[in-house]
Swiss-Prot record:
Record organism: Mycoplasma mycoides subsp. mycoides SC (strain CCUG 32753 / NCTC 10114 / PG1)
Name of the protein in its database record: Arginine--tRNA ligase
UniProt keyword list: Aminoacyl-tRNA synthetase, ATP-binding, Cytoplasm, Ligase, Nucleotide-binding, Protein biosynthesis
Subunit comment: Monomer.
Class of this enzyme: ligase
């Protein structure tokens, strides 16, 4: 695995620190316009007291040591003790050849030999996906791509909540729509789901069963015929799971394993996990309720698993599910992408799994906060379909897959998000999605022009590439691997978007001021075409992580 220029500089500084018994970590920054050097470090400032030397005096020692590496064209010392370095052109030229030889693998980290299981979306199969699910889907799928790029084995999982009262309510909701579609006066209970999507399913049921169930009664959460209730539950689950899978596929989200809550009950996983807790002396009774000793692993209080009426609390099937998942997947880490309203649930889940003998840190929760749509400066409620939510299918019709994915990935998932619909439909540089895709369109345009003129890009010597923006951009491209590592470690999708914007900002400025195809200087033109190919490749690699497409022309 090749070493980046920043890694090279860091390693050189670290070696000098070890020679001088300096324990401080070198800090490196990229200089704008390469003045007075490509990279700078404050290591001499922050460590001078440790070795009883003045910063400028220490900087001179570092300079002489760096010169011995034969990697630097120039080393400048700036008051009060900064080191500014310019690497040799042949080192810089390796960036382009590395990018174009590795292609889609550029930026890949070494194999970690660790497996991450990531569960995301996991919307109840009770209707269409809404914009909140969309944010969860984007954060989850981008993290999947990041972890793969960072060298992990990655398993993707969707947990289907197909047991519990919400499915009973779904069955009644669909049943009422079925009756209404038969022109039978059927009053919808207040707790039923809203939306015209249930009309579509009702028509499918009528086509198969006609008036067969017209005389059956119902309550708020039950059809008063067990077999019919079970039938409507299963038909509804199957229908909406199919819809959800298609909506995710249309949104460029692929999830391989779909696990079932009902299966946890059917295979007696809850009884099994209770026996495990009992064998580990992790349970006790109080006021006829069964408690789990979660305070042993940092929870603020012990948690009830079985209430005094013998019904289960929410956490018990969740613990059984996760214990089963740990055994089935053999993953080193489970990551769940959950809505922000689950925050108080995290510690008790981690403690519950630790009481089963698992690593307390095996379960990690990534929180995803709410999304609010903004149009004309105020909150926007889409009204195309009945219901209280903003449906994913509707917003995709308005803004498209790429725009929505990019914007949802561009902000920290821990923060509430205002999604400006006016901004992401603009066709100018103020729209970050347009700005990013326009860069790929410009790259393709340049390469197409060169192809028409029969000018072939060169990848070898790039010593002639000495424009400050070329050098700055080469360094940014070279840093892609570091961005991947930091983004994966921090679970930070927005860092990839920030990186894309940084490339595009420098590139658009470069494009505006430089004549890239100059038939009077073919050697430089060919080198610049190789440079453009490298820029395009890194953008495409970053786009792939976000799950959006490069654009050929705009």
């Amino acid at each position: 695995m090749s070493t980046t220029i920043i890694e090279m500089f860091y390693n050189d500084l670290k070696n000098i620190c070890q020679k001088l018994n300096i324990t401080k970590e070198p800090i490196i920054e990229i200089n704008k316009n390469n003045t007075p050097g490509l990279l700078s470090s404050s290591i001499c400032l922050i460590s001078s007291k440790q070795v009883n030397k003045k910063p400028l005096e220490l900087a001179e020692i570092f300079k002489q040591e760096l010169l011995l590496t034969n990697s630097y064209l120039n080393i400048d010392i700036a008051a009060p003790g900064f080191l500014n370095v310019l690497v040799k052109p042949e080192i810089l030229s390796n960036v382009i050849s590395n990018v174009l030889s590795l292609k889609s693998k550029y930026g890949n980290l070494e194999k970690q030999n660790k497996t991450i299981n990531i569960e995301y979306v996991s919307a109840n199969p009770t209707g269409y996906l809404h914009v909140g699910h969309a944010r969860n889907a984007v954060i989850g799928s981008v993290l999947v791509n990041l972890f793969k790029k960072a060298g992990y084995n990655v398993q993707t999982e969707y947990y289907v909540n197909d047991a519990g009262n919400q499915i009973n309510v779904l069955a009644v909701t669909v049943f009422v729509h079925y009756l209404q579609a038969l022109n039978i006066d059927a009053k919808k209970p207040e707790n039923c789901y809203a939306g015209d999507m249930y009309d579509d399913l009702a028509k499918i049921i009528i086509n198969k069963y006609n008036y067969q169930f017209k005389d059956i009664k119902y309550t708020d959460n039950k059809i008063l015929d067990y077999n019919v209730h079970s039938l409507f539950k299963q038909i509804s689950i199957d229908y909406f799971l199919k819809v959800i899978k298609q909506q995710l596929a249309d949104f460029n989200v692929k999830i391989k394993h779909w696990s079932s809550e009902q299966e946890v009950y059917d295979t007696h996983q809850i009884e099994k996990v209770l026996k495990l807790y009992e064998s580990k002396d992790a349970l006790y009774y109080k006021d006829d309720a069964l408690f789990l000793k979660t305070t042993q692993f940092g929870d603020d209080k012990d948690r009830v698993l079985v209430k005094s009426d013998k019904t289960y609390t929410y956490i018990l099937p969740d613990l059984a599910t996760h214990n089963l998942r740990i055994k089935r997947t053999k993953a080193d880490k489970l990551i769940n992408v959950w809505g922000g309203d689950h925050h108080g649930y995290i510690k008790r889940m981690q403690a519950g799994l630790a009481l089963l003998g698992n690593d307390p840190d095996i379960l990690e929760i990534q929180m995803v906060q709410m999304v609010r749509l903004i149009k004309d400066g105020s909150e926007y409620k889409m009204s195309k379909r009945k219901g209280t939510a903003v449906w994913l299918v509707d917003i995709l019709e308005l803004v498209g897959v790429d725009a929505l994915r990019y914007m949802l990935a561009s902000k920290s998932s821990n923060s509430h998000m205002d999604l400006d619909l006016d901004l992401i439909t603009l066709k100018n540089s103020s729209n970050p999605v347009y700005y990013a895709q326009y860069a790929t369109a410009r790259c393709h345009s340049i390469l197409n022009q060169a192809r028409t003129k029969k000018i072939t890009p060169l990848v070898k010597e790039t010593n002639l590439l000495n424009n400050p923006k070329e050098i700055e951009l080469l360094l940014v491209l070279d840093n892609f691997k570091e961005v991947i590592k930091n983004s994966a470690n921090n679970r930070s999708t927005q860092q990839i978007c920030d990186y894309i914007q940084n490339i595009c900002k420098i590139f658009h400025s470069y494009y505006a001021e430089i004549k890239i195809i100059d038939e009077n200087n073919l050697q430089l033109t060919k080198l610049r075409l190789g440079f453009i190919k490298a820029v395009l490749q890194v953008l495409e690699n970053a786009f792939f992580i976000i799950g959006i497409q490069p654009v050929l022309e705009m």
